[in-house]
A protein has these predicted regions:
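Catalytic-loop of the protein kinase fold
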Residues: 194-196, 201
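Activation of the activation-loop gatekeeper triad in protein kinase-fold domains
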Residues: 217-222
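Conserved N-terminal boundary motif of the eukaryotic protein kinase catalytic domain
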Residues: 9-15
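ATP-binding pocket architecture of kinase catalytic cores
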Residues: 15-178, 185-194, 208
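Conserved small/polar residues in nucleotide/adenosyl-binding loops
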Residues: 251-253
Length: 253
């Protein structure tokens, strides 16, 4: 940090941030400035470091756009610094994650919660409107044949789970019928753009004082593809008043 002009002296107020299911995030201060460090999980996977560095490229490309995202400060691509993991530093986000309890303002006012949904749609529209070529992400993904690859890719993912003990198998009711329908109905026309890859309410940060999305987070599945897949996943995972969702209904069939 000192070599990159990021202050001098010890790291203070170190706190591990919760909310993610895999990667490690620490918030700390140095010389009066706050930072968030993000690295791969404690038990690194084969591609954890590559995924972290890929995220930094995406965040750097979003700088200067109107897409709400954490600001990238610095990147360390030398895993030896932390022993085994690359990492990056980003600006802290003043917001909360809706996967936990909502603040009183949001929990008590249905119009604010309604606005949260619209704000998520607005943030996603801003992401989809970014010209990925203009921001330097022309080679960030392989849009040619992207939609055609999705069904085989995810069927293969299910098959790969067979290596884990006690996995009951991929024979989910209706799986092959749905897969066949999707393959018969692949859109013939679509506009490539930045795809978050896991866009739902737990992967955004909301303002503590209103319904606005202040940052889209957890970009490890991002690529160049059809941005409408993000919209579809948002709708599938959106919880109704009774706590149900399309996604939760499917996994309980």
């Amino acid at each position: 940090m000192s070599a990159q002009g990021l202050g001098e002296g010890p790291l203070d107020d170190i706190t591990e941030l919760s909310g993610g299911t895999q990667n490690v995030m620490l918030r700390f201060t140095r010389a009066g400035r706050s930072y968030v460090l993000r690295r791969g999980p404690r038990h690194l996977r084969p591609r954890s470091n590559a995924v972290m560095l890929r995220e930094t490229r995406l965040l750097a490309a979003l700088a200067g756009t109107d897409v709400p995202h954490p600001g990238l400060i610095a990147v360390c691509d030398d895993p030896a610094v932390l022993g085994d993991a690359v990492f990056y530093l980003m600006e802290p986000v003043d917001g909360f994650n809706a996967s936990g309890d909502l603040p009183a303002l949001h929990a008590g006012d249905p119009t604010v919660r309604y606005g949260m949904g619209l704000s998520m749609a607005d943030a996603l529209a801003k992401l989809g409107a970014v010209d990925h070529v203009a921001v330097g992400l022309a080679d960030y993904g392989k849009p040619d044949g992207f939609l055609e690859r999705q069904v085989p890719r995810w069927l293969a993912e299910l098959d790969s789970y067979g290596q884990f003990e006690n996995y009951p198998g991929p024979d989910l009711p209706g799986l092959h019928e749905v897969a066949a329908w999707l393959q018969r109905n692949v859109p013939t026309s679509w506009q490539p753009g930045i795809l978050h890859g896991d866009y739902h309410a737990a992967n955004v940060m909301f303002s503590p004082t209103g319904p606005e999305v202040v940052a889209i987070v957890d970009w490890e599945m991002s690529t160049i593809g059809d941005p409408l897949l993000d919209l579809g996943w948002l709708l599938a995972t959106w919880r109704q008043d009774d706590g149900s969702s399309v996604f939760l209904s499917l996994i309980h069939i």
